[in-house]
Amino acid sequence: MTDILDDMIARADVAELFNLPMEYLGARVVKHDYKTKYPVKYLGNKNEDYPRKNWSSVVLWNCGYSPNRILTREKVAESTGSWLHRFSWLKDDQIGDLPSEWNHLTMEYEPRDDAKLYHYTVGTPCFPEYRVQEASDLWYATYRRAVSPIDTGC
């Protein structure tokens, strides 16, 4: 099996998010507030807790929001990953909520059938130690569709 490293599968149309009001917000995210159950994740990487953890994994940006104008190419290039991932230039009230079903963290949270986006943040089922987990069947089905020949009907 070829490893695929994508760790999210959307089960709904992300266009739904564009209907959310953004006028006074710099971004909308799922505001995860948790301590990881897994101090080590895929490939032996550290999985540390930090403020606003996993907030940056699904973001609806307001590109016209004036505080976001600080994000020039140069600023992004010189900034640390933690500064960027924590939205350090935005105050809490400048970051709105996305419904939690839009960034469901498998293995970290209790399973849910209404998840619109599964995020295999600890490890995708392509890694042996994560083969059996919530929604692994969905991951494998998506993988098979992605690597199978396209049926053009010709």
Where are these regions (language model features)?
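Short, P/G- and charge-enriched loop/turn segments at secondary-structure junctions
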Residues: 43-48
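GT-A fold catalytic core of metal-dependent nucleotide-sugar glycosyltransferases
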Residues: 1-37, 60-67
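Membrane-cytosol interface at the C-terminal ends of transmembrane alpha helices
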Residues: 39-41
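Short secondary-structure boundary/capping segments
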Residues: 19, 50, 108-110
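A glycosyltransferase accessory/donor-loop signature
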Residues: 55-154
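Residues forming well-ordered secondary-structure scaffolds
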Residues: 12, 50-56
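Generic detector of bulky aromatic hydrophobic side chains
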Residues: 5-8, 50, 139
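Catalytic phosphate/metal-binding cores of nucleic-acid and nucleotide-processing enzymes, i.e., regions
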Residues: 20-26, 51-53, 143
